């Protein structure tokens, strides 16, 4: 029981230490979430929004299995976008 409490205290201390000592080029841990999506410099930079898509007659994998999708307006037929 004492060992568990000591481990919890140690983890909390190390987490706090990491946050305090984090190097931030903007002089501190400033409001990371204060800007709205419209105010961001490059909202298109998100990797989630930039998915590679395959053109017509290019190889594709069924979306349930893989991460290669056909471009909008096309569907993944038997291993090719049509």
Swiss-Prot record:
Keywords: Calcium channel impairing toxin, Disulfide bond, Ion channel impairing toxin, Knottin, Neurotoxin, Secreted, Signal, Toxin, Voltage-gated sodium channel impairing toxin
Tissue-specificity statement: Expressed by the venom duct.
Keyword Metal-binding found: no
Pfam family, one: Conotoxin
Origin: domain of life: Eukaryota
Subcellular localization, as worded in the UniProt entry: Secreted
Keyword Disulfide bond among record annotations: yes
Family named by the database record: Belongs to the conotoxin O1 superfamily.
Protein name in the entry: Mu-conotoxin MrVIA
Organism: Conus marmoreus (Marble cone)
